[in-house]
Amino acid sequence: MIVTTHSPVIVEQAQIENLATVQNQEGVVTVTSLGGADDLMQRLRRARPSSLLARRVVVAEGKTEHGLLLECLDAWDLQRTKDGRSTSAGEGVAIQDGNGGTEVGPRAEALSRLGLNVAAFLDNDDESINESIASAETLGVKVIRWDQGRNTEGQICSGLEANGLTALLKLGVELRSSEDTVLQDLNAIEPENPVPSLDVEEWISLGTELEDARERIAKAADKRKWFKNVDGGRALGGWIVRNYTRQQLSSTVAYLEQIKAFVYPERPDLSEDNSDEKLDG
């Protein structure tokens, strides 16, 4: 028998009927065999073996969210290391790309059935997946979704003022290689109403409503795939981290703080034992 805590190679290569997870929850040990696992678990084992070695797993909807969270974890880990606290690795955390919204619920549910602590992080613009997400939630999966009707790009843009939108467009230029390309992306959204520049304050001075500017930029970023790979997600995450305390991003940060709380759970301080303390009568 081989017991591993860190080697995904063993998880990948072993016959699945020979695999089992072992969880210790407050002294109660639970062993769950993967024998007879369905096709979904087989795919998870092959594509994301590290998830089966984790204590806590965040299933992110896609590459954008995956990269965004990786960048956030790097920043949070750095600060926690400076503070002398545990990192995400120390907490046994794995971030998994769910490969799309329809996969998030079933994947999170399958991992939860193995006894793992699981969170699902996804968009909130597709009602067709609500049932599978609710099913996962009933098993104890922590579900973190953006505001109703929003995807990642829409959530971020929803609170930005003109200067914040212009700053986001500058990030788009870095990823799309030129200002002209980003301008073409924007004008492809509303070809009958082109914008003259990447300065959103100029748009507004010419009559564009702020909400319309937010929607156009969010749609362009989504449809032209500015952040639709892990590197793009990381770039977006880095931009959020640099502006984390700005009020314009408060609605986005509120959801990221939920993920942070899941990744680094608070534990009771056992340094002070007052069980024998006597009170004055």
What positions do the PLM features span?
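Acidic, Mg2+-coordinating catalytic modules of nucleic-acid enzymes
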Residues: 47-59, 63-281
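Switch/communication elements of ASCE P-loop NTPase nucleotide-binding domains
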Residues: 1-50, 250-257, 261-281
